[in-house]
Every structure is written in C-alpha cells, then in structure tokens.
C-alpha cells in the first residue's frame, strides 16, 4: 500500500460505530460460550412492522463480502447487503428498567417501530 493510500485508510471513519458497551457484552458472551472463534454478525432482513428488521447472531465464518470491525478483541461482521442499510449506524448494548439488549441507532431509518427492531428507509 502506498503512503498516500495508507494515510487515507487510517483517516477514513469506520462505516459503523461499535460501542465499548456492545463490544464488552459480546466479549462476555463469547467467553461464556468458550469458543474464541465466535464473531458477532449483524444483519438486516425483510420483515417486521416497518419493512426491515435487524438481526444478531454469532458466527465462526467470515465471508468474502463481509465488512469486519474489531473492538477490544471482539470481531463484528456485516454482510454487503446489510451494510448499505447500516452505514453510519451505532451498535450499542443497553441495560435499563425494560431489560438488556443490543440496540442499533440508524440515521438511515426514516421510520422505526416501537420496539426498535424494525425500520424503513
């Protein structure tokens, strides 16, 4: 990689914000499973009351078209189709009176449902 390309690559912001809270919870869950090869896969699929819904799963396999992000020793994977809906989003983990859950704050969503797991663009 040329010096210019390397400089540009280091200056470009990450397409997704993966918070310390989310990475910490994923790390905790991976340690509980006892499988250090597990990575958090975030995806978008059709469905939900607003047209699209978010999904989270653990995966050991990294596909060629996956965008990979690492934070605090944890790997986040997003497939190419889902990435177009998630660019600029923040993936967080919240614990409050309503419970504990992974949350996506998506600036691309024009409508969201009350539970926050469904959206439209």
UniProtKB/Swiss-Prot annotation:
Quote the InterPro entries the UniProt record gives.
FeS_biogenesis (IPR000361), FeS_cluster_insertion (IPR016092), FeS_cluster_insertion_CS (IPR017870), FeS_cluster_insertion_RrpA (IPR023063), HesB-like_dom_sf (IPR035903)
Q: Name the coiled-coil region(s).
A: none
Q: Which domain of life is it from?
A: Bacteria
Q: Where does iron-sulfur cluster bind?
A: 49, 113, 115
Which parts of the chain span the membrane according to its record?
none
Recorded hits in Gene3D superfamilies, A to Z, give: HesB-like domain
Protein's UniProt keywords contain Metal-binding: yes
Cofactors per UniProt?
A: iron-sulfur cluster
Cofactor note from UniProt?
Answer: Binds 1 iron-sulfur cluster per subunit.
Look up keyword Iron and say if it applies. Answer: yes
Q: Which GO terms describe its biological process?
A: iron-sulfur cluster assembly
GO MF annotation: an example:
4 iron, 4 sulfur cluster binding
Write the record's keywords in alphabetical order, separated by commas: Iron, Iron-sulfur, Metal-binding
Family statement: Belongs to the HesB/IscA family.
Describe its partners and assembly state.
Answer: Homodimer.
Under the heading NCBIfam families, the entry gives: iron-sulfur cluster assembly accessory protein, PRK13623.1
General function of this protein? Required for insertion of 4Fe-4S clusters.
Q: What is this protein called?
A: Putative iron-sulfur cluster insertion protein ErpA
